[in-house]
């Protein structure tokens, strides 16, 4: 230790001589050394300088010196401060670790607690232990299945009732629909149906008979207009039969039959005018009477047919407006 103390030298004064020719600094130092000499007492107002390189005298007994600390003491204080700082750092680290590894908090390196994990309680037995608050608002699946089955049964019954009521409605409308034969399958388009000759009905409850040929043959225009009218009425009837039947919109044949048969009796509609003249017993005037009857019957039959066509068109127009044809399947 003594060798180390001898090697260490402290710089007490640092003299900076900027002017080499001016000995002002040296004179001041000489004066200071003279003042510090132990022979003379210290003057007040002057700085007291101590030489750190001097060895402190041995302590005689218990004696406290209030002077500056020796370098040995300074080194010991520095070592002690370093040790204390290291201990404080270690204690702070330990406190942090203890605070992090508490009973309620999980350790950062360990497995997390199961409280933070989420579980699906759909099929677990713990579901029965949970409170059933929403059980009255949402019915159980068994009741839902029962409701669905009851709904299915009710819909099946409604379909059966509707299917059972359909034939009765068709039968009710059959007296008016028998005038024009409707298609068996209502899904077919009315254009694809073949045009059949119309039927005539003498009474409301009588059976249907095939319509006889037109009595007046030499007039082709009236027959063409009658066929067009019958085809239009038949198409309208097919459209109405394919959809829900409208009893008020279908024209009844009772008004058309007496108009056509005004000149001829209903029982003798199929007989020609020649046969009528022969039954009366005038063989000499057959041709004349036939021509007269033809001439007389022409305007009546044509007027009657014109009336029937106009009436049928007037009645068929609201039917076309009421029953809108759907898209062809």
Swiss-Prot record:
Phosphoserine found at: 22, 65, 70, 124, 185, 189
Compositional bias ranges of the Low complexity kind: 222-231, 300-316
Sequence repeats: 38-41, 68-71, 103-106, 194-197, 212-215
Principal localisation: cytoplasm
One CC-aspect GO term: nucleoplasm
Signal peptide annotation: none
InterPro entries, per database record: DDA3/GTSE-1, GTSE1_N
Molecular function terms, GO-annotated: microtubule binding
Region ranges (Disordered): 93-329
Reported tissue expression: Highly expressed in heart, brain and lung. Weaker expression in kidney and testis.
Gene Ontology BP term (one): microtubule bundle formation
Coiled coil regions, renumbered to chain: 70-94
Function: Required for normal progression through mitosis. Required for normal congress of chromosomes at the metaphase plate, and for normal rate of chromosomal segregation during anaphase. Plays a role in the regulation of mitotic spindle dynamics. Increases the rate of turnover of microtubules on metaphase spindles, and contributes to the generation of normal tension across sister kinetochores. Recruits KIF2A and ANKRD53 to the mitotic spindle and spindle poles. May participate in p53/TP53-regulated growth suppression.
Subunit structure: Interacts with APC2. Interacts with KIF2A. Interacts with ANKRD53; recruits ANKRD53 to the spindle during mitosis.
Protein name per the record: Proline/serine-rich coiled-coil protein 1
Taxonomic lineage of the native organism: Eukaryota, Metazoa, Chordata, Craniata, Vertebrata
